[in-house]
């Protein structure tokens, strides 16, 4: 019986679009998935801070080989930023390091500041983060009271939309953010506060999208435990990735590691999904000289 269960578990391949609750780490969610599905192979696709809720896709079985593609996709967030208070962690969980009366701030001031953070920007990673410096995680150094120099990183802000603004001594702005992988929204809040010369911190954050996975379709952990969460096929992780469809003998050859004899017009290095006629993911390939070179086969 145990062997049969293990064999059944090994056949579980797909992606779960989950709603991570605040208070759990991303690794906690992965452990929950392993227990709920009885699988050993599972992994998340981009860390969410423990205090942050939102979309956390978890890959299971052979779909874990797709994790890097989801992790590298754009993300969307809804954020609450409180002005007039800066913290050492740049969010509401740290110690207050500076305060200022920000009652003079207007909606127009914040809207203008947001325009200065569109497009490519440089961010210095916060000390309380998983970034490594000299082989050490920054948060490990921060726990010891050590602060080190961090190199700025270039990220891309696709959209910053001011949804609402609440004035007062501690004004609050509600914004939607669409950004590239590696963007720290709490650092964005901190930098907005510096730009407006009043200080600020991220007081609330929820991730509303990770690649093709959206909050409205995310399942709770309670739904997963009750067997009500849908395990999506690996192809669901592809989003708008270019695709080539093959069938018959060509599909069988792909599963044996032979690239399909097709011409593509994508630039060299572009990742292309090779799918069967029924939409099932067969392989990931790379455009190479007008043809395809297989990189990962999902046979």
UniProtKB/Swiss-Prot annotation:
It catalyses: uridine(55) in tRNA = pseudouridine(55) in tRNA. Transmembrane segments: none annotated. It is an enzyme of class 5 (isomerase). Residues 241-299 form the PUA domain. One of its GO terms (molecular function) is tRNA pseudouridine(55) synthase activity. The active site is at 49 (nucleophile). Keywords: Isomerase, tRNA processing. CDD domains: PseudoU_synth_EcTruB (cd02573). Its EC number is 5.4.99.25. One of its GO terms (biological process) is tRNA pseudouridine synthesis. Belongs to the pseudouridine synthase TruB family. Type 1 subfamily. Responsible for synthesis of pseudouridine from uracil-55 in the psi GC loop of transfer RNAs. This is tRNA pseudouridine synthase B. It comes from Symbiobacterium thermophilum (strain DSM 24528 / JCM 14929 / IAM 14863 / T).
């Amino acid at each position: 019986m145990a062997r049969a269960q293990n064999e059944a578990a090994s056949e579980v391949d797909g992606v779960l679009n989950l709603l991570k609750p605040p208070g759990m780490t991303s690794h906690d969610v992965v452990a929950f998935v392993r227990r709920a599905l009885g699988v050993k192979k599972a992994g998340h696709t981009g860390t969410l801070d423990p205090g942050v809720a939102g979309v956390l896709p978890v890959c299971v079985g052979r779909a874990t080989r797709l994790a890097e593609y989801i992790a590298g996709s754009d993300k969307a967030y809804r954020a609450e930023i409180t002005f007039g208070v800066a913290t050492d962690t740049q969010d509401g969980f740290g110690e207050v390091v500076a305060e200022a009366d920000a009652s003079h701030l207007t909606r127009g001031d914040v809207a203008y500041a947001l325009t200065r953070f569109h497009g490519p920007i440089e961010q210095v990673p916060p000390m309380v983060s998983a970034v490594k410096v000299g082989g050490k995680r920054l948060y490990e150094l921060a726990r010891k009271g050590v602060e080190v120099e961090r190199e700025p990183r270039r990220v891309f802000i696709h959209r910053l939309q001011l949804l609402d603004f609440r004035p007062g001594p501690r004004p609050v702005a509600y914004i939607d953010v669409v950004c590239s992988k590696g963007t720290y929204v709490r650092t964005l809040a901190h930098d907005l506060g510096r730009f407006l010369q009043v200080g600020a911190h991220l007081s609330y954050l929820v991730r509303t999208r990770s690649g093709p996975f959206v909050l409205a379709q995310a399942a709770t952990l309670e739904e997963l435990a009750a067997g009500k969460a849908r395990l999506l096929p690996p192809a669901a992780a592809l989003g708008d990735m270019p695709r080539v469809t093959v069938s018959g003998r060509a599909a069988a050859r792909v599963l044996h590691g032979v690239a399909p004899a097709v011409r593509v017009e994508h630039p060299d290095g572009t990742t292309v999904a090779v799918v069967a006629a029924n939409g099932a993911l067969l392989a990931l390939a790379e455009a190479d000289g007008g043809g395809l070179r297989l990189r990962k086969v999902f046979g």
